[in-house]
Each structure stands twice: as structure tokens, then as C-alpha cells.
């Protein structure tokens, strides 16, 4: 009997063009007006995006109204995405002259906990349901972070990027660097009471690591990832994108309306291919379909 395969869409739902954002400047959330087109495309294929939302987006009434409508129709899920630098409570970290934005794992444990509680409560208050799925800002996880997520009732995380080393992505404090996932695999694991469902990334000799993440130039590579993942033992395929990448000028990758049209051309191709062999599910729904994973939370 052929094993059932599931397609999980994860969207880091955050402010506009954070790649080029500078501290002290206004942080826009205009991309909230550009999410409906993507959701409609997902609906067309009966796919269910998980909008992993951060502080500024959950405080944006446009996003909340949009997501609530989709939640009521069971067309999406809302999980948590945490950017430590603008999520209360605020705590002054040491910094170097040339520093990056802070990772949550740079903060003392009690501050980490309070920031997680802040985001969890905000999402619950805005949507009427406590979030149970999560992705870390800047992909930064450690055992303490997993433990704190478990404390707050989270059941699944999707921050691990197999075969990818983020140590060149510096943090705020002197000498702090991002996580090294280069030795991680695509296998699901259980960490401090939380199920880790890694992003789908394929390691190849010729092209290095390949993601299911559109960048305008990688349609062929994405189709290859879809094909190889289907041939593998993995029962899920995980796509990722940022909400701001759905808006012209919302990212360095899709700067123009033409770039957005190319994005949707590629999305149509890969979604059609994926729909042949995969059933769309949200991240929480995927967990609920696997009783074994649920048992690990007890």
C-alpha cells in the first residue's frame, strides 16, 4: 500500500522587507494587503498554509481580519514566529559596532520565557485560540528554547534547516552567531517535549542545498526537490516563504510586480505538481494525524 504524503506550507508572516530594515526606522506591514492572492491559490489546490505570525503582524488589524476569515473556513492555521528584537519585554543586550539583529537565544532564560509568553498570549487574544506551532526568528533554536516552548504548550517546531550552517549570520552580542544545522538531517525528532519537523531541504553534490522556496530562478530545482522527496521515505514536503515576499518591493528577491508575477507562475507549476501526490495539511493538523507524535508530548 502506498504511503500517504502530506504537503505543509509554512509562511513566516512578518513585516515588510526585514532584510533591509534598520533599527530605529518604521517597520511596515503593508504586505498584509497582499496575502489573499496566495491564500486563494492555496484554496484552489486544497492546500492549507500555516501563517507563522510575529509581533507586528499579529498587531495589524488587516492581517488579523484576513486570517480569522480563513480560520473560520478551515483554510489555514496560525502559528507563532518570534523576532526577539521587537517583541516585549525589552531587555538591553551588549552590542558590537557591527552587529546583527538579536536571536532569542541570546537573552537570559527568564527574558526568553517572557517574550514567548507575550507572543503566545497576543495570538490567543487576537484569534481566540492558543498557538501550538512555531518557527524561530532567524532560525535560531537551542535546547532552552525547545524547553520553554514545551512549557507554554507548543507541540511542533519547524526551525531546523538540514545541512545549513547559519554561523555567518551574526547576532547582536559580541561573538554570537547563528545555529549550525549542517549535521542535521531531515528526520523528525523530539526535543525537550516538542516535535521538530525540519524544513524540506535536499543536499546535492552538484548544486549544494536545495529548498522548496521560490527565488525567481529555481523552478527546475524545486521540481527536483518535489520529485526526490516523493521517492524518499519522508511522508511530508515542507514549503517556506515570507509573507513580505508576496508583495512587490517587500523583499530583495521580488522587487517588482513582474517579479511577483514570476513567483506566481512558479507557484502554479509546483502546486499543480505537488497536488498529484500530496494532501495539503496545516502544521498542527499534520501533528494530529500522527498519533505517535502526539504521544511524545505526554
Sequence positions of predicted segments:
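Hydrophobic faces of well-ordered beta-strands that scaffold small-molecule active sites
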Residues: 7-11, 49-51, 78-82, 132-134, ...
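Metal-dependent polysaccharide deacetylase catalytic core of the NodB/CE4 family, i.e.
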Residues: 55-136, 140
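Acidic-and-aromatic substrate-binding clefts and catalytic sites of carbohydrate-active enzymes
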Residues: 26-32, 52-64, 86, 135-143, ...
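The substrate-binding groove and active-site-proximal loops of carbohydrate-active enzymes
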Residues: 20-30, 48-57, 100-112, 131-132, ...
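Acidic (Asp/Glu)-rich catalytic clusters
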Residues: 36-47, 58-87, 150, 189-192, ...
Amino acid at each position: 500500500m502506498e504511503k500517504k504524503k502530506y504537503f505543509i506550507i509554512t509562511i513566516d508572516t512578518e513585516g515588510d522587507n526585514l532584510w533591509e530594515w534598520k533599527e530605529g526606522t518604521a517597520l511596515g506591514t503593508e504586505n498584509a494587503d497582499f496575502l489573499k492572492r496566495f491564500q486563494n491559490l492555496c484554496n484552489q489546490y486544497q492546500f492549507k498554509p500555516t501563517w507563522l505570525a510575529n509581533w507586528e503582524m499579529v498587531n495589524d488589524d488587516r492581517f488579523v481580519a484576513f486570517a480569522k476569515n480563513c480560520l473560520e473556513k478551515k483554510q489555514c492555521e496560525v502559528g507563532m514566529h518570534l523576532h526577539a528584537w521587537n517583541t516585549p519585554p525589552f531587555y538591553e543586550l551588549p552590542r558590537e559596532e557591527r552587529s546583527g539583529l538579536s536571536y532569542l537565544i541570546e537573552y537570559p532564560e527568564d527574558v526568553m520565557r517572557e517574550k514567548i509568553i507575550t507572543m503566545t498570549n497576543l495570538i490567543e487574544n487576537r484569534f481566540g485560540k492558543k498557538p501550538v506551532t512555531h518557527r524561530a526568528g532567524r532560525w535560531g533554536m537551542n535546547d532552552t528554547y525547545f524547553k520553554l516552548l514545551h512549557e507554554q504548550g507548543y507541540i511542533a517546531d519547524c526551525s531546523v534547516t538540514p545541512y545549513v550552517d547559519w554561523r555567518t549570520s551574526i547576532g547582536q552580542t559580541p561573538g554570537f552567531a547563528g545555529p549550525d544545522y549542517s549535521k542535521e538531517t531531515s528526520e523528525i525528532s523530539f526535543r525537550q517535549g516538542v516535535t521538530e519537523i525540519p524544513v524540506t531541504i535536499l543536499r546535492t553534490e552538484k548544486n549544494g542545498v536545495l529548498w522548496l522556496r521560490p527565488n525567481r530562478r529555481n523552478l527546475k530545482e524545486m521540481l527536483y526537490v518535489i520529485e526526490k522527496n516523493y521517492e524518499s521515505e519522508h511522508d511530508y514536503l515542507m514549503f517556506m516563504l515570507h509573507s513580505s515576499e508576496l508583495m512587490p518591493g517587500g523583499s530583495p528577491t521580488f522587487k517588482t510586480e513582474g517579479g511577483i508575477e514570476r513567483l506566481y507562475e512558479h507557484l502554479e507549476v509546483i502546486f499543480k505538481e505537488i497536488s498529484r501526490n500530496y494532501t495539503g495539511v496545516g502544521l498542527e493538523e499534520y501533528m494530529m494525524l500522527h498519533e505517535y507524535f502526539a504521544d511524545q508530548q505526554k
